UniProtKB/Swiss-Prot annotation:
GO MF term (any one): double-stranded DNA binding
HAMAP family: RdgC
Location in the cell: Cytoplasm, Nucleoid
Taxonomic source organism: Edwardsiella ictaluri (strain 93-146)
Protein name (record): Recombination-associated protein RdgC
A GO biological-process term: regulation of DNA recombination
Cited function: May be involved in recombination.
PANTHER family, per database record: RECOMBINATION-ASSOCIATED PROTEIN RDGC
Record family assignment: Belongs to the RdgC family.
Length: 303
C-alpha cells in the first residue's frame, strides 16, 4: 500500500450516505479509461488494490479508500511550434500570401490534433480517504488544485458532495508562531528543526530554516519584528512527522519504522490482507492525529 505523503482535509458539512457497496455502481460510471487518439486528458476511478481486485472502493472500520487516475498527453511547446511554423510556411509559399491570424489559429488546432496520437502520456494517481465516522474527506494531494479536481470527479460520480475545506477558529499561523516563540507545544507534539516565517507585509520577506533549533534568539528576533510562522515541522508522539502549513495543509508525512512495522507479521505474499491491515493502521493513526491537531490549533469554526 502507498502510505499517504500529504493530507488536504475537507469537512462534509451535511450528512450524506457514503456506503462503499452503494458507491461501487456510482463510481463505475466514471471508471478510468485511457485517452483516445484525440483526447488531451482523461480522469477516472481505478481499484485501490490495483490488479488484485476490480472493486473501486476499499473499506475498513468505516473508512473508505478511493483512487483517481489521470492521463495527460504531453506535447512539448517547441514541437507544436515547429510543426505549426512548417505548415504555415508551406501554405504561405503555395498561396503566395501571408496567412491571417484566424487562419493560423485554425491551423494550430489542426496541427495539435495531428500530433496527439503520437504524443506520450503522463499518468498520476491521487488517493482519497473518506472517514465516514468523523465526516471528513482527506486527499493525498500536494496541491489544492489536484484535490479539487478529484473532489469534482467524486461529486460528479455521486451527484452531490457537500464538502468545504477544514477551517479553524483561530488563524493557524498565530498558533504556530506562539508555539515557536514560547517553545511550548501541546501534549504529543514536538517542534522539529524546520520552519518558514513570513512578514505580515508582502515586502517584508520570507525566512526558511532547516536543520536549526527554532527556539533561539535568532528566530525570536524575526518574530518580534512581525514575522509569522507559516510552515512548521512537527513530531507527533514519535510516530508521525509532518510539516503543517498555515492553510491547514499537511505535507511530507513520515510514519515511524515502529509504526510501519506493526504489520510485519502479515505475509507480504497475501497482498490484499497486508493492504487491508496497512490501510486500517494508517487511517487509525491519522484519524487520531487529525483530531488532536484540530484541538491543539483551537478547534474548528462552527458550521
Amino acid at each position: 500500500m502507498l502510505w499517504f505523503k500529504n493530507l488536504l482535509i475537507y469537512r462534509l458539512n451535511r450528512e450524506i450516505p457514503l456506503v462503499a457497496q452503494e458507491m461501487e455502481s456510482q463510481l463505475s460510471a466514471m471508471a478510468f479509461t485511457p485517452c483516445g487518439s484525440q483526447d488531451m486528458s482523461r480522469t477516472g476511478w481505478v481499484p485501490p488494490l490495483g490488479g488484485g481486485s476490480d472493486a473501486l472502493t476499499h473499506c475498513a472500520n468505516g473508512q473508505i479508500l478511493l483512487c483517481a487516475r489521470k492521463e495527460e498527453k504531453i506535447l512539448p511547446a517547441p514541437v507544436l511550434k515547429q510543426a505549426l511554423q512548417a505548415k504555415i510556411e508551406r501554405l504561405e509559399g503555395e498561396q503566395h500570401r501571408k496567412l491571417k491570424k484566424t487562419e493560423k489559429d485554425a491551423l494550430k488546432d489542426e496541427v495539435l490534433h495531428s500530433l496527439l496520437p503520437r504524443a506520450f502520456s503522463r499518468f498520476n494517481q491521487t488517493w482519497l480517504w473518506i472517514d465516514s465516522v468523523n465526516n471528513l474527506i482527506m486527499l493525498d494531494a500536494a496541491s489544492a488544485k489536484r484535490a479539487e479536481d478529484v473532489l469534482a470527479l467524486l461529486r460528479k460520480s455521486l451527484g452531490s458532495l457537500p464538502v468545504v475545506p477544514l477551517t479553524l477558529d483561530k488563524p493557524i499561523e498565530m498558533t504556530l508562531t506562539e508555539w515557536v516563540r514560547s517553545g511550548n507545544t501541546p501534549a504529543g507534539f514536538c517542534l522539529q528543526d524546520e520552519a518558514e516565517l513570513k512578514a505580515i507585509l508582502e515586502e517584508g520577506g520570507v525566512i526558511r530554516c532547516k536543520q536549526q533549533a527554532l527556539v533561539c534568539d535568532e528566530i525570536a528576533v524575526h518574530i518580534e519584528a512581525g514575522k509569522l510562522v507559516t510552515k512548521l515541522a512537527l513530531d507527533w508522539h514519535e510516530r508521525i512527522q509532518l510539516v503543517l502549513a498555515d492553510d491547514g495543509a499537511i505535507k511530507r508525512l513520515k510514519f515511524s519504522e515502529t509504526l510501519r512495522d506493526q504489520n510485519e507479521d502479515i505475509d507480504r505474499e497475501d497482498a490484499a490482507l497486508r493492504f487491508d491491515a496497512d490501510f486500517a493502521l494508517m487511517t487509525g493513526e491519522l484519524a487520531v492525529l487529525i483530531d488532536e491537531l484540530i484541538t491543539a490549533l483551537g478547534g474548528e469554526t462552527a458550521q
